[in-house]
């Protein structure tokens, strides 16, 4: 098992190429299941979750190859698909596997998808996926840890429906969006998620021949078509990777350009960084951040897009930990999203948890120690903390990091960080 060694105290300078978004690439790989024609995806990040999704759809019989000539390009053909099943062995490490449910049901009329590992119906919105697809005419039962979905006897297509979810669900919106493209009639999604990755998925589906309006709003309208065709599509840049590097530079100090970064997808985070004291400028296909000295602590509350993203909460907390002043961070999206706090405290941070709120008293200096990553974004926050801590910091269990960041330590090293991957 690998770990990272970080020697803190170096400012950052240069440029970083932002990779394609994991949270767009995963549903877009599943969207290839909707057609028998070839789909080419460009700017696909080299992540563990992407590798798992490729393994999952290959297991179904999909031909999926990374191009030898074009890095980041994946060529997919679901024509020879033989088994509309997502087994537990391949699903247990990745919740996004539920995204195969809608496309399989829409194109093949059946799907058997394992419940994601550790997922209790009700605590995560898997029940919303089931309700929505049932509204479109699917018969779905949950037994032995699997969702078994079928079209009723004599029915060859899902039926368009009005679907209103009980809460905003990103993967639910994506599942219904994909399923509705091949449904009979019109589907209207109310209370839809507005994340840029959903807009990117919709743009890909439109290239495939889907009829979609309203993506990027709370109400999406889809007119079903009989078949979709292949397409070539470039995965949108990863706004969370972008935000992570912005926080790293704000914390460590420096002057860095993030190529392919989309400021319009990170407006709330960028505004907070400016209020903290960083200079952030942006243009077509880049964001530049300049920072020096201690930032000013910023309070925030996570909400659905376009609010402050829960996936940026831990990274910004690392910045607040060494900022001037006291801040509060309120987490409204997920439970158990403060698992990084105890590890940051080991580095010298002064943070108290009060229910869904963290109170952070900024300190002048963190000190290096051995810490353990507990999840994807927590691991990124510990890397940021390590960049500013005195002495050496070792971050263990970085397989979490590899799930969502494409060569993070190499990119940081390229802008001046003293960081290396080691065998634990």
From Swiss-Prot:
The modification 2-(S-cysteinyl)pyruvic acid O-phosphothioketal is found at residue 119. UDP-N-acetyl-alpha-D-glucosamine binds at residues 95, 124-128, 311, 333. It is found in: Cytoplasm. CDD domains: UdpNAET. It is an enzyme of class 2 (transferase). One of its GO terms (biological process) is peptidoglycan biosynthetic process. It holds the Pfam family EPSP_synthase. Belongs to the EPSP synthase family. MurA subfamily. This is UDP-N-acetylglucosamine 1-carboxyvinyltransferase. The lineage of its organism: Bacteria, Pseudomonadati, Pseudomonadota, Betaproteobacteria, Burkholderiales.
């Amino acid at each position: 098992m690998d770990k990272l060694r970080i020697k803190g105290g170096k400012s950052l300078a240069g440029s970083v190429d932002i990779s394609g978004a994991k949270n767009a690439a995963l549903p877009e790989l599943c969207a290839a299941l909707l057609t028998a024609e070839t789909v080419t995806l460009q700017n696909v990040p080299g992540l563990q979750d992407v590798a798992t999704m490729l393994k999952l759809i290959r297991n179904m019989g999909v031909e999926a190859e990374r191009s030898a000539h074009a890095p980041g390009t994946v060529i997919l053909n679901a024509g020879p698909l033989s088994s509309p099943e997502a087994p537990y062995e391949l699903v247990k490490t990745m919740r996004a596997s539920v995204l195969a449910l809608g496309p399989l049901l829409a194109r093949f009329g059946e799907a058997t998808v394992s419940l994601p590992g550790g997922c209790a119906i009700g605590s995560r919105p898997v029940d919303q996926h089931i309700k929505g697809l049932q509204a479109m005419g699917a018969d779905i039962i949950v037994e032995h840890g699997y969702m078994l979905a079928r079209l009723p006897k004599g029915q060859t297509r899902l039926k368009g429906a009005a679907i209103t979810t009980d809460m905003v669900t990103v993967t639910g919106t994506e599942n219904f969006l994909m399923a509705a493209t091949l449904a009979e009639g019109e589907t209207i999604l109310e209370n839809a998620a507005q994340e840029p990755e959903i807009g990117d998925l919709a743009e890909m589906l439109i290239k495939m021949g889907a009829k979609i309006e309203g993506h990027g709003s709370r109400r999406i309208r889809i007119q079903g078509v009989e078949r979709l065709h292949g397409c070539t599509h470039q995965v949108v840049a990863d706004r969370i990777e972008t935000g992570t590097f912005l926080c790293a530079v704000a914390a460590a100090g420096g002057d860095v350009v993030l190529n392919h970064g989309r400021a319009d997808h990170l407006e709330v985070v960028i505004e907070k960084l400016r209020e903290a004291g960083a200079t952030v400028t942006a243009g077509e296909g880049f964001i530049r951040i300049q920072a020096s000295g201690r930032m000013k602590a910023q309070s925030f509350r996570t909400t659905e897009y376009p609010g402050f993203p829960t996936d940026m909460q831990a990274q910004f907390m690392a910045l607040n930990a060494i900022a001037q002043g006291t801040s509060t961070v309120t987490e409204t999206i997920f439970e158990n999203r403060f698992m990084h706090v105890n590890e940051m405290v080991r580095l010298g941070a002064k943070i108290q948890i009060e229910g869904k709120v963290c109170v952070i008293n900024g300190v002048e200096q963190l000190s290096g120690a051995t810490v353990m990553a507990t999840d994807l974004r927590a691991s990124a926050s510990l890397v940021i903390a390590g960049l500013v801590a005195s002495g050496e910091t070792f971050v263990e269990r970085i397989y979490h990091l590899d799930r969502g960041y494409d060569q993070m330590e190499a990119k940081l090293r390229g802008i001046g960080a003293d960081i290396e991957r080691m065998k634990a």
